[in-house]
Amino acid sequence: MRVPAILVVLALWLSVADGIRERDFRVPRFASLTIGRLHYDGGGDWYAGPSALPNLLAALRQRTALPVAERERVVTLTGPELWDVPYLFMTGHGNVRFSDDEVKQLRRWLEQGGFLHADDDYGMDKSFRREIARVFPDHPMVEVPLSHPIYHLVYDFPRGIPKIHEHDGLPAQGFGIFLGNRLVVYYSYQTDLGDGWEDPEVHHDPPELHEAALRMGVNLFTYAVSATR
């Protein structure tokens, strides 16, 4: 674990918070450091894995100096609570659908500092790709290079995102959308990363997989709160 990196991230976040107070309304004002769970329409189980985010937040409190809340917040794309979180998580096994207004609001939030992590729980791939292409038709998803900070910021993942659950023999992949040099959307695919955050007895994961999933989550969150400009 790179302890100095955590201190750098905290300093960066504090400088961002100071800057937010000095800037205009277009800069998102993150009220607290927590994770927003996206309540989306379309029929998919957006609520899947109820123990996942509390466990990740607990790991962040234990392993970093970041002032992280104990619980996630359920948010919608058109509600004011979206602007209170720096990191938005979405998962599920079914269909995802955004309204035209939700598409506009999500793009605006991401352009102004937000970070979306979509975790395909083996079922939402087709609909997520369709909907995120509506949000950024001019910025297609690309595979995130292994040199990117999300794989090295706190813990090293030289081979990229870890494979947590095996379903069809395909490798785990991390895709993303960049605005300039900033990664604003991260899509964990063919891995079940969020399932790895859940209580180990839920999926009977071995300790090393649970730990790998939490470590990757720590990297993602610390990147999200340190790359808001």
Annotate each language-model stretch with its function:
Residues 4-15:
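Bacterial N-terminal signal peptides
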Residues 66-76, 118-121, 139-147:
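Surface-exposed patches in mature extracellular/periplasmic domains of secreted proteins
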Residues 16-87, 91-94, 192-193, 199-229:
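Aromatic-Pro/Gly-enriched surface loop or interdomain linker
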Residues 43, 125-201, 207-218:
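An acidic, glycine-rich "communication" segment
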Residues 71-77, 99-105, 169-173:
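Alpha-helical scaffolding within the catalytic cores
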Residues 35, 87-126:
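Short alpha-beta junction capping motif
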Residues 50-57, 103, 107, 125, ...:
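Extracytoplasmic/secreted envelope proteins and their assembly/folding machinery
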Residues 31-33, 83-87, 112-115, 139, ...:
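Loop/turn elements at helix/coil->beta-strand transitions in domains of secreted/extracellular proteins
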